[in-house]
Swiss-Prot record:
Residues 68-77 have a biased composition (Polar residues). Gene3D superfamilies: Homeodomain-like, RNA polymerase sigma-54 factor, core-binding domain. Keywords: DNA-binding, DNA-directed RNA polymerase, Nitrogen fixation, Nucleotidyltransferase, Sigma factor, Transcription, Transcription regulation, Transferase. The lineage of its organism: Bacteria, Pseudomonadati, Pseudomonadota, Gammaproteobacteria, Pseudomonadales. This is RNA polymerase sigma-54 factor. The keyword Ribonucleoprotein does not apply. The gene is rpoN.
Amino acid sequence: MKPSLVLKMGQQLTMTPQLQQAIRLLQLSTLDLQQEIQEALDSNPMLERQEDAEDYDSPDMLGEHGDQSTLDTTPGSYQEGYESGAASEDGGTLEEGDWHERIPSELPVDTAWEDIYQTSASNLPSTDEDEWDFTTRTSTGESLQSHLLWQLNLTPMSDTDRLIAVTLIDSINSDGYLEAALEEILASLDPELGVELDEVEMVLRRIQQFEPAGIAARDLSESLLLQLRQLPPDTPWLEEAKRLAKDYLDLLGNRDFTQLMRRMKLKEEELRPVIELIQSLNPRPGAQIESSEPEYVVPDVIVRKHNDRWLVELNQEAVPRLRINPHYAGFIRRADASADNTFMRNQLQEARWFIKSLQSRNETLMKVSTQIVEHQRGFLDYGEEAMKPLVLHDIAEAVGMHESTISRVTTQKYMHTPRGIYELKYFFSSHVSTAEGGECSSTAIRAIIKKLIAAENPKKPLSDSKIAGLLEEQGIQVARRTVAKYRESLSIAPSSERKRLM
């Protein structure tokens, strides 16, 4: 068979750069999107924030009619179209409606394309005082090491001992425990100093007198003893608590109260205040000072109740409203093929697509959020126990999109409700069959389990089998292993570890 050229007609799907951009913006979190918008504003002179438009409100900059066009990235308020003051890509002026000639009314973000962009953590740009800040964790602004070094500088000590102290402080972790053995710390010191192990131990004891109480301990028992030694000598049951912390901490951890009473030769009513004294201590003393970086969550959607109806709206403060800069757009001329004019036309087209991508993202987010609220009105009214089963397919079918699109739009997107701020994925859960043939959400079952355990007798905590039986009485058929899985997901210990003295 001879090789030959064959001409065929066919169709294939192509991932255009504009579609890639739309999908990338769709899956970004609000903080990442703010960073992306800022980069676009810095690199594209055709884009500007709507609040910056005041600089161009004079007739001299907008042309004789003084009209300006705003492309609002907020759904429901998109005013597109230039008047006589701007020019089209091909030259001349842009008549109203010409903005849509090269931009489809809907971006086809519904696609199975998965790997265009890998999101990464980004810093939040500088914000105004009134920007949303719902869930900021407060920070003391001081590390544990700096707090201990500050106390060290106030402590009279020889230069050699001070060097040992600094080495010890460097080996204390964020919980306040000494991570390295004293032999390792001794080996790290200069041999010419002639330091002995007992000198390192002596310096450690001085550091253990610093605040917070219990610092620089080598294990939990030593930390508790250090805290007990700083209590007033007349503290009730102090000596018994020291004995318990030193010799019987493992029995307390295993909730073996019978053996604990036998070993300490105490009655139940005597052991109870001893345990209460131990429980008043801090097992992680360093956490009082050490704090992690503040975590910020900016809600994308706000849900509120008005006249017995749940209303869904985008957080207007989360994403700035953008528009085409009419001043620069007015410089574009039809027949000018110069490099500068070509650059301006390309920047104008990129700005159009960027604004359209933001519009598409916001519209998709609104559609999905509205459907979630529609499905989970019971949760908003009554709490977790009223949560309904919901999977991605249910929302995808309701809004007419692919499940992969719903997955993107619900990842790292947050909804602010009267009950708190939740990631959109929180509202999705699997279902468990009920005795009546209905379905119950796994989230609702977790809430019921949590409620049952909170109301249990501390001396006789509910076992997983007993909880499964109580759920069955409510018409929810759940196996014991499923109860154990739900309990562990709630970070609740098994019944043997929940048992305590009354």
